[in-house]
């Protein structure tokens, strides 16, 4: 009897044959599972790690957040610890410098004895911002009616520019008496002639001198003398007394009153001896 026949005879008389076959099958299954698992690991090792996985892994390593440590803390302590460990990059920075590279500086032009000043808003403003810019310029120009802008002090504050100056009010009762002469015997009066100023008595109506010319003497090079009269500022006697019911101390005082009434006093006193 050959060996195969002997094996069959032995197996036929083996009491634990079923159990042995089951153990053999389970052993074979475990061997195949281990083989497939080892094969999968080897295949994964040959493939490069995806870029998104690398970025996520590196970003986690950049933070000080320690999940293992936080699990040991109370809920309140976890919140405090988490706030302490927030990355600096998450903080919002509002201090962003803004520059207008295409901004055009103001341009002063002169044509035929007239001057013009062109102002240009910064490029890139919205429609609302442009309107706000225009209203700011208009407000500055409007303020020149009440003071001399050239005499104002500019305060450069942290959040604004502030102009400070002496307010000019057209108060007729406080008109400054002229120290310059006005001579009645001459048809032309000067604001810079020697002698005491002409005092007007109660019987003399200053408006009777409405057509009398008064010469304003220039005090700046390049500015010519100018002659003015009351009718340059007032259209009628009623208008004259409606502006200043108390009248003026002299003819030059009335001229100064007219300059203030027309909002020209600040400009005139910069150019002429009043």
Swiss-Prot record:
Residues 171-193 have a biased composition (Polar residues). Phosphorylated in the N-terminus by host CK2. Phosphorylation of the phosphoprotein is required for the transcriptional function of the P-L complex. Residues 254-274 are annotated as: Interaction with the Nucleoprotein-RNA and template-binding. Residues 104-165 are annotated as: Oligomerization. Residues 49-101 are annotated as: Interaction with the L polymerase. Residues 22-65, 170-196 are annotated as: Disordered. Residues 54-65 have a biased composition (Acidic residues). Residues 27-36 have a biased composition (Basic and acidic residues). Residues 1-59 are annotated as: Interaction with N(0). GO terms for cellular component: host cell cytoplasm; virion component. SUPFAM superfamilies: Phosphoprotein oligomerization domain-like. The modification Phosphoserine is found at residues 59, 61, 236, 242. GO terms for molecular function: RNA-directed RNA polymerase activity. Residues 166-202 are annotated as: Hinge. The keyword Chaperone applies. The record marks 133, 136 as: Involved in oligomerization. Transmembrane segments: none annotated. InterPro entries: P-protein-C_vesiculovirus, Phosphoprotein_C_viral, Phosphoprotein_central. It is found in: Virion; Host cytoplasm. The record marks 260 as: Interaction with the Nucleoprotein-RNA. The modification Phosphotyrosine is found at residue 14. Homodimer. Interacts with the L polymerase; the association of P and L forms the polymerase complex and positions P optimally for encapsidation of newly synthesized genomes with the nucleoprotein. Interacts (via N-terminus) with N(0). Interacts (via C-terminus) with N in ribonucleocapsid (via C-terminus); this interaction allows to package the L polymerase in the virion and positions the polymerase on the template, since P acts as a bridge between N and L. Belongs to the vesiculovirus protein P family. Nonenzymatic cofactor regulating the function and conformation of the RNA polymerase and part of the transcription and replication complex. Binds the viral ribonucleocapsid and positions the L polymerase on the template. Acts as a chaperone for newly synthesized free N protein, so-called N(0). Plays a role in virion assembly. This is Phosphoprotein.
């Amino acid at each position: 009897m050959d060996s195969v026949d002997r094996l069959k005879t032995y197996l036929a008389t083996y009491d634990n044959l079923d159990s042995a076959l089951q153990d053999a099958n389970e052993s074979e299954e475990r061997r195949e599972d281990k083989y497939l698992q080892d094969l999968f690991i080897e295949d994964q090792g040959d493939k490069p790690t995806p870029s998104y996985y690398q970025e996520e892994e590196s970003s986690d390593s950049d933070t000080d957040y320690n999940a293992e440590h936080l699990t040991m803390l109370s809920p309140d302590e976890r919140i405090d610890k988490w706030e302490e460990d927030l990355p600096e990059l998450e903080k919002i920075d509002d201090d962003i410098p803004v520059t207008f590279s295409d901004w055009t500086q103001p341009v002063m032009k002169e044509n035929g004895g007239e001057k013009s000043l062109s102002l240009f808003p910064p490029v890139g403003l919205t429609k609302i911002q442009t309107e706000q810019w225009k209203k700011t310029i208009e407000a500055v120009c409007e303020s020149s009616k009440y003071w001399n802008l050239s005499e104002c002090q500019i305060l450069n504050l942290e959040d604004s520019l502030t102009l400070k100056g002496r307010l000019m009010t057209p108060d007729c009762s406080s008109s400054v008496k002229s120290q310059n002469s006005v001579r009645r015997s001459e048809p032309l009066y000067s604001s810079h002639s020697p002698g005491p100023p002409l005092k007007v008595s109660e019987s003399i109506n200053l408006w009777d001198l409405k057509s009398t010319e008064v010469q304003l003497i220039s005090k700046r090079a390049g500015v010519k003398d100018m002659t003015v009269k009351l009718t340059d500022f007032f259209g009628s006697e009623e208008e004259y007394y409606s502006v200043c019911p108390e009248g003026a101390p002299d003819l030059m005082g009335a001229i100064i009153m007219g300059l203030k009434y027309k909002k020209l006093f600040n400009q005139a006193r910069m150019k002429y001896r009043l």
